[in-house]
Each structure stands twice: as C-alpha cells, then as structure tokens.
Design a protein with these regions (language model features):
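C-terminal accessory regions
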Residues: 516, 530, 558-679
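Conserved helicase NTPase motor core
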Residues: 2-14, 18-23, 111-112, 164-262, ...
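Conserved helicase core region in the C-terminal RecA-like lobe
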Residues: 79-89, 213-217, 242, 344, ...
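Conserved RecA-like helicase ATPase core segment
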Residues: 226-316
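ATP-hydrolysis module of ASCE/P-loop NTPase motor domains
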Residues: 78, 96-173, 178-184, 408-416
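P-loop NTPase Walker
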Residues: 1-98, 288-291, 598
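ATPase/helicase motor core of nucleic-acid motors
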Residues: 266, 334-466
C-alpha cells in the first residue's frame, strides 16, 4: 500500500469521539487506517490502557499488535484481544471472585476435546464403530458452534419450534456434549463468551475504564459477541465498528449481517458512518466485476469498490472446460502465490487429483490432504482394486487403509444391521483380511446383503491394470454401487457433496483416459511434485476469507451447486438436492462469490462449464441475472466480465472521454466515484 493516505482514510484517523461505523471494501487498507487512528489518539493524550481493540482471530490480533508497537515505538500499547481471549479474562475474574464455578479451559487442539465430541456424537447418533468420518464430526462441531453463538441450550433446541426440522440426533448429541463438559468441569471458548456476557450484565463496572473500543470484522460477529460489545460500552465510551456487510459469509455459524447493516446505528446513537471504498489489492476490471455482482443483493449499494492507481492491472480469464487438469496444463500463470478456491469440498478433492495428475505441488490451507477421508473415494478405490486384483492387497499396511475401507463400507449400500458395521470394519482391518470371507460370514441369513455381496463379486478381476479407470467406474455404476453414494450421510449438504464428488471424478477420468493402475497410484501413492513453483493452496471459499494471493483459480462454478445450501445443513437428508435455495441464502452465496473473486491480486481464472447462455451474455456484454436456470452459476453472468473488461481497458488506455457513450449507467457511476476519490 502507498504511504499516503486517501482522504477517506484521513477522515477516519482524525475522527475524535463518538460512535463510528467504517464500511471497508476488500483490500482497502483498513489495518493501516486503524493503526494510524490509534497512533493519533495516543499522541493527542488518550491513555493507551483506555483503548480496547477486538480482532476476529488470533493471527489478526498478533499482526495488529506488532504493527501498533512499531507505530507507537512503545511497549505500552492498547489492549488488543480476540473476543475469546477477552471473555477468558473476564471469566478468570469471575472465578477469582467466586462468582462462577472454576473450570478447566478445553481447546479444539486438546485430545480430551476430540474424545468428548466423539463420545457425544456416538451417543446422539447411536454410532458403534471406533472410526468416525471426520466430515460428520465437523458437521456436529458446526452445529454446536451455531447453538453456542446464539446461546441456545439443549433444552431450547429440543423445544423451540425453529429447531423442529433439525435432525433429532444432532440435538441429542448436543445435549450429551453439554453434560460431558459439566460432568468434567470443563469449558470451551464459546462457553467463556456466554459466561462473560452474564458477568458483564451483573457487574456494570467491568470494562468501565475503556473509553475507546474498536471492533474489526464486525460483519462476522454473532449475537453473543454483539451483546458483549454493547455491555462493555458505557455512556462515555466511543465505539468504532469496522467491516463490510458484503463480506458477511458466516450466517450459518451465527454471524448476523444486520448488526453492521443497521442495528449498530440503532444501538449506538449519533453514529458517524465512514467509507473505505478504495481497494489497494486489485485493478479496475475486477473491481467492476465485484460491484456488478454484489449490487444484485437487497442491501443498498451506496459506495462502489474502486481501485487505487497503485494496484496491479488484474487480468481475468474464463475457461469453458470441465477438465481442470487441462486448464492447469494450459495456464500461463506468472510467478507468485496461487490458490484454487471452491464452494464445496468435493471440488477440492477433484482439484487435488488433477494437481497430482499434472505433477504440480499443493497444500491445503487448513490441514493436510483429506482425499482419503472422502467416502466416495473409498468406494471407488476398493471398486478398482476388486475389479483389477480381486482383493485389497494394495491397501495392506497403507496408512490410510482404515479411512478408505470405512468409505467403501459406508457407501456400498449393504443396509447394515446393528453391530454389523463395526464388525465389518474390524474384520477388514485385520492383517491379510479376506473381504469375501469376512463379509460372507457376517451376512449369513441376510439375503439382501448376500445378494449385494454377490453383485460385488461379479466385477472381480474383470479388468486389468491397463483398463481405463472410467470403464471400471462405468461397471460399478451398472452394478448399482455408485447409486448409494451419499445415502448414509448425516447432512443433506454432505450427501450432495459426495454425489458431486463422484460427478467431478467421472469428468476427470473421462477426459484424462488414465488407466486403473495410474488412478490407484494417484490416490494411494502419488509421485513427487515439481519444485520450481509455489504450491497451489487449496481452500474452500469460506476458508479463504481475509486472505489474498497473486493468482486465484475458482472452480465448481455450476448453478446446481453454487448457490448451494448452508455448509452445516443438518436438516433431513432425504430432502431433494434440487430444492431451490431461499432468496436470503442466494444473497449469502452471492457475498461468498464476491469474497472469492476479491482474493486475487494479479490474475483470476474462472473455470465454468460449457454454457451457450453464458457465451451469449458475454458476447452482448450483459451483466444481468438470467431468468431461466443457467448451467454456469448465475454469479458469473451477473459479473458481466466482457463489459467490465471493456470499461477497464478504457480507463487504462485513457480513452474514457471518447467512449463515454458506450458505458452503462452503472459503469458511469464507477467512473464518477473514481474521479471523486481523486486517488
């Protein structure tokens, strides 16, 4: 970022007292602005200890602390905390005063927490096997987080009509989870927030020394965090909230866009509203596209995101191709950081296989490869092993054998009876276990299961290592072993994600024509990747929030899955995957697309399916929402890529005045804002 502040930044830095709301677009230099503001407050006589700065996560808190220390050139700096760490401090005070019961803090990284969650899950879902699908545990944890964010107790969840269509298993498991915490005198960070708010309500002197409170990423706060901020604010406190309603993408875990979209101004009288509408991250073409998409939401767009002259001339490309490996092979990506982002985990699994096929390095943003934990991968791998070798010899001593066998058993459609699944998994995990005898003994007297096992036997050793993997997949489909994928899922979204995973892998195998042995090696024994370029970072769009890369590839841009359902959708699994999302869900998904494309600095690649309608939209330079259901996601239509490229070129070529009549009213608005900013 340039050292000179824009006039928008200067007005925030010089704000004196009183409540303020700062609406900041992606990459607008808000951290620099807030550091300068705090620096000014301290230099004009404000006691640093009377300033509280609340950051959304630990990494942001650490980064801001270092920058503020450098700016103030002092070890005495304001209190900079996450909501969780402040809550922990307040809870510690409550324990010392013997107002609340003393408990141990348990964090997600603690092995006891993992055991506790699994124990609660087994209770709620009557789950017998020792191994539990990590994706199912993640869904359960998200449900817990959503309940905690709104201070919903198990009794509330069981009796509140708004929870009537939630799967009962989740509520039973949640109840057991809360009991286990209490029985073991444990509390989580989410519990700390709830208890801290209760303490603040009962003791108004807590936090009374804070005269300035700054809250970053306010669009991501939930009800408990919002209440905490209000209770810390006294009559002489100035609260400044900073955020962007267009980046509120965590509603499914308790965030509320209305806190920044209107409630803040209602709760804090005489709030002064500031804008940070100038981005330092990407060029005009991408700014125009981001504005074009997000204006379709019901939240009134009063200021556009406008690119600063110092930003790179970001290049946007569209690829009409379902084969990611072809796109990766043809990309002339310049040097720099690079990421592949997706709405769903299924597409990340597809991307991982494509990257392995191309010999390109990669790593997941959060954690290691999850390919082996996907149940559709389990049944495909076992299906190919049986089709080629007739047994599971290649899985012997493989580190991921249990996860792969679990996936196979989960998706094979055996209609497990009580106790069978656990016995089958244990039997197949034994050294040199024979699948046919292990399952055959288990299915004695169960005709459907015996018939199912017999159908599986018909594919044995029908193919060789050189047989195209797509042919083996076709055989599995013909025998009915792919139809059941996703049918045992705990959540509707999880089930749909697994089904889409099969579709993505079908597309990759069909286009690449790799043989069965190559497919098995890609999954079980991937080769060494190239070392002459930065690894691709794989992340969901939700996980990419707050980050940026030089080059970004967006995949999974199909209308059928984006807009999709909530990531932690815990409603009935049998609901049709084609149920159209509600308008408010579409708006959250549109914000998610907006967040995704604005992670880019230099080059954005959008991988879309073949769609004649989109081709027509681009040819005519349209940017409207299609009335008929499209093939590619509606958000790519709304982005109006060709129209934005046309206007962007005019700006960079200094031909705006000559071509003014060719620009839409919306793009003329952008040009006026660009001129008005005088950046």
């Amino acid at each position: 970022m340039t050292k000179r502040l824009t006039w928008e930044q200067k007005s925030i830095v010089s704000h004196d007292t009183g409540h303020a709301l700062v609406k900041a677009v992606p990459g607008s230099g808000k951290t620099t602005t807030l550091v300068k503001r705090v620096e000014r407050l301290v230099k004009t006589g404000t006691d640093p200890r009377s300033i509280l700065i609340l950051m959304y996560n630990k990494s942001a808190q650490v980064s801001f602390t270092e920058k503020l220390k450098t700016a103030l050139m002092s070890s005495v700096i304001p209190e900079i905390r996450t909501f969780h760490s402040l809550a922990l401090k307040i809870v510690g005070y409550g324990e010392r005063q013997q107002i609340i019961k003393k408990k141990d803090l348990i964090t997600p990284s603690d092995y006891r927490y993992e055991q506790l969650v699994k124990q609660a899950y087994r209770y709620g879902f009557d789950h017998e096997a020792n191994y539990i699908d990590p994706n199912e545990i993640e869904n359960f944890e998200l449900f817990i987080a959503r309940c905690r964010a709104a201070a919903v107790t198990p009794v509330d969840a069981a009796n509140d009509p708004t929870f009537s269509n939630i799967k009962r298993e989740f509520i039973h498991a949640y109840g057991r989870y809360c009991e286990l915490l209490e029985e073991n005198s444990l509390r989580t960070f989410d519990d700390c927030l709830i208890e801290a708010v209760a303490l603040l309500r009962n003791d108004s002197s807590l936090g009374a020394h804070f005269k300035h409170i700054i809250v970053d990423e306010y669009q991501d706060v939930n009800l408990i965090q919002h209440d905490m901020t209000r209770l810390l604010s006294k009559s002489d406190t100035s609260v400044m909230a900073v955020g962007d309603v267009n980046q509120c993408i965590y509603e499914w875990r308790g965030a509320r866009p209305d806190f920044i979209g209107g409630l803040f101004e209602r709760h804090y009288p005489n709030t002064k509203v500031f804008q940070l509408s100038c981005t330092f991250r990407f060029g005009h073409e991408l700014s125009l596209m981001a504005n074009s998409v997000i204006r379709r939401n019901s939240t009134k767009l009063t200021k556009l995101c406008v690119s600063h002259p110092s930003t790179p001339k970001t290049e946007v490309r569209l690829h009409f191709d379902n084969c990611l490996s072809k796109v990766l092979s043809n990309l002339s990506v310049s040097s720099g950081t690079q990421a592949i982002l997706s709405r769903t985990k299924a597409n990340l699994a597809w991307a991982e296989i494509a990257l392995r096929l191309c010999g390109l390095p990669y790593r997941y943003l959060n954690g290691s490869s999850a390919l082996h934990t996907r149940t559709e991968i389990g049944i495909l791998v076992v299906g190919v092993l049986l089709s080629v070798y007739g047994d599971l010899r290649l899985l012997e001593n493989h580190p991921n054998k249990q996860a792969i066998v679990y996936g196979f058993l989960k998706e094979a459609g055996f209609r497990w009876q009580k106790g069978q699944f656990k016995a089958a998994l244990s039997g197949l995990m034994a050294p040199h276990a024979d699948l046919w005898s292990a399952l055959g003994q288990l299915f004695e007297g169960a005709q459907y299961q015996k018939d199912r096992l017999g159908r599986l036997a018909t594919i044995c050793q029908k193919d060789g290592e050189e047989t195209p993997a797509i042919d083996v997949l076709r055989r599995l489909i013909m025998e009915g072993f792919i139809d059941s994928v996703g049918s045992e899922g705990v959540t509707r979204t999880g089930s749909n994600d697994q089904q889409r995973g099969v579709v993505r892998i079908w597309e990759l195998l069909d286009s690449s024509k790799i043989d069965s042995r190559t497919f098995l090696n890609l999954i079980l024994n991937p080769g060494e990747a190239a070392t002459d370029c930065d690894p691709f970072i794989l992340s969901t769009l939700h996980g990419s929030k707050g980050l940026e890369w030089d080059n970004v590839i967006l995949i999974g841009l199909n209308e059928q899955e984006f807009p999709g359902g909530k990531p932690d959708d815990v409603y009935s699994v049998r609901t049709s995957m084609n149920t159209p999302p509600a308008e408010e869900e579409i708006e959250e998904e549109r914000r998610l697309f907006y967040v995704g494309i604005t992670r880019t600095k230099q080059q954005l690649n959008l991988v879309v399916p073949l769609d004649e309608g989109l081709a027509r939209w681009l040819k005519n330079r349209w940017d409207s929402t299609p009335k008929k259901s499209p093939i590619a996601t509606r958000f790519v239509y709304e982005a109006g890529w060709t129209a934005c490229a046309f206007t962007s070129d005019a700006i960079y070529n200094s031909t705006v005045e000559k071509q003014k009549a060719d620009f839409s009213k919306f793009h003329q608005w952008y040009l006026r804002d660009l001129q008005r900013l005088k950046v």
